[in-house]
Each structure stands twice: as structure tokens, then as C-alpha cells.
């Protein structure tokens, strides 16, 4: 894992991508810091951090678009998967390299409350709690970007997918207000989601029987739960969408609350979007080794019989 981490970190620090991301975050922070703290004389650095959360919509797609997509495009992923490195080490090493790049502007941000303290009273506990929350929010966004980069070998598509998903999460609080909170509408929505999941499973495995069975079981279970206790569905859509409201979980950190649930939430999001890459990479590793074995057998066959 250490070798992958050093290799990935070096690639970002020897190219413009890493420096562009660092510059972008620091410039936005400087602009809002000048507006809120220096000009308006607000003593809370949390206002600045809360205002620049949108920076992840632009910065994270740029930072993560090449992390796995470029490996697949250049076919260097096959070299990694056949190397004597664990699959988890590959994924974690790449992810930690991106987190390290993000930690550079975060280290600079830690100096802002110290600068503010020279001109007035600053609540350091509140300020650095917000800094911690902002860092965890960024780590969760980076994990989403790494996952999207693994879905395609085109960097532009990876960046667009990351932007779309992050924008949807960013607007999740507003999106939830468009849905009714009645149990009937929630049940119908979940039924459509189960149908969509069955269709997606069919497109992946091309087995209509298994897809139909999964869909029918899901729909029947949904109907039974609704008949037995329909009240459980009230406001269900809002509860589900709230799980994906990344910015909403960051609000507690900016309100002088050391939110343990928020810390667990951001760590869970980071784990949830990086852990699926491990079995997928493991399957690719097995395919690469099988292909290498077949090529070796073919060379042996040619050396003995072609002559």
C-alpha cells in the first residue's frame, strides 16, 4: 500500500492537477475569509467554511477524475492487479494519496483562526471543530469521486458523473421538499425504485428469471409491510434522502457542535464508496491472472508445435 500511496501522491505533486486543486481551494477560502472576517469583522471562521462547501462540486471532479479512469485507459491497471500488492492496498493507497493532497490546503486553513486571534477574540474550539467537519466532508466527497472514476476509463465522463452526484447530494435538502410525506406516495416511490433495481440487475446479469424473482419478492414484501403498518412509510422519502444530505450533516460542525454522529456518518460514506472497489478489483485481478496464464500456455504451445 505504501508504494501505491507514494506513487499516486508523486503523480499529483509532479503534475498541475494537485496544485490546481490546492490553489482553487485556497483562493476561494481567501476570498470568503477577506469578505467575512477581514471586511465584515465576523469572529467566526465557520461562516467561511460553510460558504465554500460548493468548492467540492468543482474541485473534487478535477482531482479524482484520473485516479482510476486513467489506469484503465492506459491499461496500467492490469500491471497493478498482477503486482504483489493487495487489492485493498491499491484502493486505500490511491484514496489516501488524494486525501493527503486535500490535507495541504486544510493545513493552511488551520492558520486562519490564529490570524484572527491577533485582531480579536476567537473561539478556537468552535473554529477547529468546523475545520474537522470540513475535512471529513471533503474526504467523503473524494471517496465518491474515486468510486465514479472506477466506473469508466474516460476522465471527462468520470468528472461529469462526480459533479452530477455531488450536486444531487448538495441539493438533497431541496429535492426532498418536492416529495409528499404521505405513506401511499412513499410506498409507490419505493415500489418504482424496486422495479428500477430489478431492471438494473437484469442489465448486469442478463438473467430475466433471477431479476424477476428479486423484483417480485421486493414488491410483495413492500405491500405486506404497507398493509400491516402503513404509518412506517410516512416521511420515508425524506428520511432516505436525508441520508445522502452531506452538507446537512456538516451544519452541526459549523454550529459549535462536536457531532459524533456526523463523524461516523462521513467515515461511513467514505468507507461505503471505497469498499465496493475492492471486490471489483479482486475480480479484475483474477481475470488478469487467468489471461496471463492463458498467454503463458499459448507461448509454450507455440514454442513446441509451431516449429
Regions found by a protein language model. Give the residues of each.
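Hydrophobic alpha-helical transmembrane segments
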Residues: 1-82, 105-111, 203-206, 214, ...
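Helix-loop-helix units of permease transmembrane domains in multi-pass membrane transporters
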Residues: 67-97
